[in-house]
């Protein structure tokens, strides 16, 4: 599917990734800044479809790959339909640029993979019955900048074809904590996986490390490690 995107037309991408409640979601978002809190479910690279008809900055956040060739290829794919891209360790720059210019923006964040050690914004949550570490940037960016948060419920129709619906997790104004926003994200992703387990990318080795090991290493390098909750709020 990703290889097909090298030559796929915008019309074909919209045919393969049909967003059923786009008009309703656009009405809710209006001119607000917002976060697309995605997961490795279905063909997540197809989220580039959003940039076709929405011409404000849609910033896809990524982790640079170890292979320079693959990294260039994936950046090309993500930019083809108008998406901007920003490495996780340099995300603050484009965010502040858009905030200063008062230009609307969307951030595409995928938080269901293991955070890297260079990312201090980590949070433990119970996920699929196990203590699991998540990148906590969804909650922190949402609260710091008053950004709405949506996730995407994806269903496979046939090979390489999906339909999806945006689900609002946070309206940008509700008086809840960063952690509660993350709880909603984790719960939504788990529900989607339990409903359609075959669509999730299980190869990310989510439970390679245990909380005790992370805490020990975090202490050794002087980072503050979040505690593992007994259960999500």
Predicted segments with their positions:
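Membrane-anchoring hydrophobic helices of lipid-metabolizing enzymes
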Residues: 1-38, 71-76, 82-83, 228
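Short, flexible loop segments at the rims of nucleotide/cofactor-binding pockets, characterized by
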Residues: 9-17, 63, 82-88, 127-129, ...
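A conditional alpha-helix N-cap/helix-loop micro-motif detector
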Residues: 15-22, 41, 67, 88-89, ...
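Conserved beta-strand termini and adjacent loop/short-helix elements that scaffold enzyme active sites
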Residues: 20-22, 61-63, 88, 167-169, ...
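Non-catalytic C-terminal accessory region of glycerolipid acyltransferases
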Residues: 26-30, 53, 80, 92-233
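Catalytic core of membrane glycerolipid acyltransferases/transacylases, capturing the structured
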Residues: 30-89, 116-126
């Amino acid at each position: 599917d990703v290889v097909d995107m090298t030559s796929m037309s915008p019309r074909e991408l919209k045919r393969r990734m049909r967003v059923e409640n786009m008009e309703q979601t656009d009405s809710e978002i209006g001119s607000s800044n917002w976060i697309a809190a995605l997961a490795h479910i279905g063909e997540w690279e197809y989220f580039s479809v959003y940039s076709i008809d929405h011409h404000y900055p849609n910033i896809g956040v990524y982790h640079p790959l170890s292979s320079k060739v693959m990294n260039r290829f994936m950046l090309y794919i993500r930019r083809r339909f108008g998406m901007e891209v920003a490495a996780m360790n340099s995300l603050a720059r484009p965010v502040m640029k858009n905030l200063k210019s008062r230009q609307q923006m969307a951030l595409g964040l995928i938080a269901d993979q293991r955070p890297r050690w260079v990312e201090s914004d980590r949070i433990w949550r119970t996920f699929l019955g196990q203590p699991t570490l998540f990148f906590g940037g969804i909650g922190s960016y949402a609260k710091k900048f008053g950004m709405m948060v949506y996730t995407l419920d994806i269903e496979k129709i046939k090979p390489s074809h999906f339909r999806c619906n945006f689900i609002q997790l946070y309206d940008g104004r509700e008086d809840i904590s960063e952690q509660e926003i993350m709880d909603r994200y984790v719960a939504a992703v788990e529900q989607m996986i339990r409903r359609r387990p075959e669509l999730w990318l299980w190869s990310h080795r989510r439970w390679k490390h245990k909380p005790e090991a992370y805490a020990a290493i975090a202490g050794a390098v002087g980072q503050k490690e979040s505690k593992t909750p007994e259960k999500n709020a």
